[in-house]
Amino acid sequence: MKKVGILNSEISKIVADMGHMDTLAVVDLGFPIPQGVKKVDLVVDRGKPGLMEVIEILLRELKVERIILAKEMDEKSIQTKQELLKLIEKMNGPVEVVTVPHKEFKEMSKNVKGIIRTGADIPYSNVILVGGVIF
């Protein structure tokens, strides 16, 4: 039995397969999952697990160089955005932050390696992580 790192076998595989510029989406419980994209559904209840909890665990193993957020976060969930940026910088170091309209974010999610659905119930609490390099 694996005893350290990401214990969810599906997420562990997605993270292990991530290369430079590959993308992984971590989304709220209402996000529409595109057909044909690998989905890992972690939701057990509203808010559980939360977005930050999942991001923190992912960043223990995944190097990120850029994140993509919906512009609507600035109006609907600015506190979540600020917490997310603080957590990512703490765990990963500085990253480029790209914001796009939510409609474009949904289109971009059609091309990710996987989507992890959290229990987050805060509007627009979705992020696309873009893989970096460790050298």
Curated annotation (Swiss-Prot):
Keywords: Carbohydrate metabolism, Cytoplasm, Isomerase
InterPro entries per record: D-ribose_pyranase (IPR023064), RbsD-like_sf (IPR023750), RbsD_FucU (IPR007721)
Catalytic residues as annotated in Swiss-Prot or TrEMBL: 20
Location within or outside the cell: Cytoplasm
GO terms for MF: D-ribose pyranase activity; fucose binding; intramolecular lyase activity; racemase and epimerase activity, acting on carbohydrates and derivatives
SUPFAM superfamilies: RbsD-like
Annotated transmembrane regions: none
Listed GO biological process terms: D-ribose catabolic process; fucose metabolic process; fucosylation
Catalysed reactions listed for this entry: beta-D-ribopyranose = beta-D-ribofuranose
GO cellular component: cytoplasm
Role: Catalyzes the interconversion of beta-pyran and beta-furan forms of D-ribose.
Subunit structure: Homodecamer.
Protein name per its UniProtKB record: D-ribose pyranase
